[in-house]
């Protein structure tokens, strides 16, 4: 498949800037697929600001689909979805293209593994983790969050693959009866150590 015939997918983030984890993600994209990563700049200091950003997300993403001819959209950032629960359906209706979210796709992956209890690693605070846990509970998955702080927001960007591995290893040893480890929040980037974890 030539580049001109590649499937063109939008990957929209509520963040305002390009994260280093995007480079790791793009390295996984197969031939024949073009992924446009588009930061939308929907919050400045706190993920809680996203509770008021659903309309802006909808407008910006709908415009990008029309301008760039995206065949589908991946909406990143669990905090966006858990604070704007109707956003995925509104995006599907407004854009007319398939839309998935971080939570929807990750939940589907956990179900494919028949995992009913997962250790959930995030760079979020306790209140945001509670919302993520509520979503997962509604999907039939018992979420277990580590007792130790993983570093929230931009601080999580400074973690090396070795540090992410050690955090996950320690959290797994402290958790009971989990069937999977689920990384939510790519700022806590596990891509450099997934094979070692498995």
Describe these PLM feature segments.
Residues 165-198:
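Hydrophobic alpha-helical
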Residues 82-93, 133, 191-198:
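Short Gly/Thr/Asp-enriched flexible loops that form oxyanion-binding sites at enzyme active sites
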């Amino acid at each position: 498949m030539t580049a001109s015939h590649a499937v063109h997918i939008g990957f929209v983030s509520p963040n305002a800037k390009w994260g280093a984890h995007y480079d790791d993600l793009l390295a996984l994209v197969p031939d024949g697929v073009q992924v446009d990563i588009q930061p939308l700049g929907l919050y400045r200091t706190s993920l809680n600001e996203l509770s008021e950003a659903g309309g802006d997300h909808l407008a910006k993403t709908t415009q990008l689909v029309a301008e760039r001819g995206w065949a589908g959209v991946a909406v990143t950032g669990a905090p966006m979805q858990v604070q704007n629960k109707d956003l995925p359906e509104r995006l599907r209706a407004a854009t007319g293209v398939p839309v998935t979210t971080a939570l929807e796709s990750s939940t589907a992956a956990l179900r494919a593994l028949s995992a009913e209890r997962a250790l959930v690693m995030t760079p979020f605070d306790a209140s945001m983790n509670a919302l993520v846990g509520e979503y997962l509970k509604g999907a039939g998955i018992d979420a277990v969050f580590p007792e130790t702080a993983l570093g929230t927001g931009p601080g999580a960007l400074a973690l090396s693959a070795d540090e992410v591995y050690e955090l996950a290893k320690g959290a797994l040893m402290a958790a009971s009866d989990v069937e999977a480890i689920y990384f939510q929040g790519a700022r806590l980037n596990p891509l450099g150590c997934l094979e070692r974890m498995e």
